Amino acid sequence: MNITRRKLIQSTAITAAATAAPIKLVYGQSAEFTYKFANNVPLTHPVNVRAKAAADAIRNETNGRLDIQIFPSSQLGSDTDTLSQLRSGGVEFFTLSGLILSTLVPAAALSGVGFAFSDYPAVWKAMDGELGTYIRAQIAKANLVAMDKIWDNGFRQTTTSSKPITSPADLRGLKIRVPVSPMWASMFKAFDSAPASVNASEMYTALQTKVVDAQENPLSVVSLFKLNEVQKYCSQTNHMWDGFWFLANRRAWERLPVPLREIAAKHLNAAAMSQRSDMATLNSSLQQDLTGKGMVFNTLATDAFRDKLRTAGYYAEWKAKFGAEAWAILERSVGTLG
């Protein structure tokens, strides 16, 4: 099963319809356990395509005892609201970006440290290994259960209107839109950029009117927001990677008999592996499509960017915030940062 750009873009209409009423993708007759799975991506996003397949498989293998209903597109509230519902038990399952989860579990932001990962093999080695194990243990302290396999949210790329980014010097003085996050702001300040927080809904206009000259996001966001219309260059900086943790309310999870838990975990983790592959295919097709629309792509070596962050004190700042133990685990996974 391939997730194509066309399917992703078609989500616009589906998302609008989804806000009107809950979408129950799995139906059943008096399931013993009916659990809600909330997320913030459209129905046709690889997360929901694979979650739907997993929910079907779980229902079939449990003989209808566990019925997982999917609520896409932030239908049950904002990320902050839904995280609160997950903690209270109002929602049983939720996929959430590690960088957003870090508001509750600071260690979850470890995977988003600037230029920590050189490529996807490095990501999966760390997140399926010691680093992922450490972060899941910290998540458990918040009374949440994280599935073993994290889902892919993607590497973030940098788009600009005037020139490609080829070295840290190209970021100097650049007015760049970033999310409201200390990690993003401190990284671009370390590059001597001028980061500005702009809501996603206002991003296109801000770029069009030159309030900001650049932005950074995964390619899926560049495509969905049609940023190629106001941005000429896309530099594949891969400066941050982020994933979706598949989270469960601990009480709800432990309410399931052990055999049902094992079945659910098996299919959810398998779905994560398939979704990772889907995202790789999607990103490749998005680059081809955006190139066809006139966007100019370039790749770059990242060593100079790491060196700049090191000398600017960015890594030292975040090592102090995360603590020596967490930082040592990160560096064992990705190599010495600073």
Each PLM stretch: what is its role?
Residues 2-122, 130-131, 137-338:
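N-terminal secretory/targeting leader peptides
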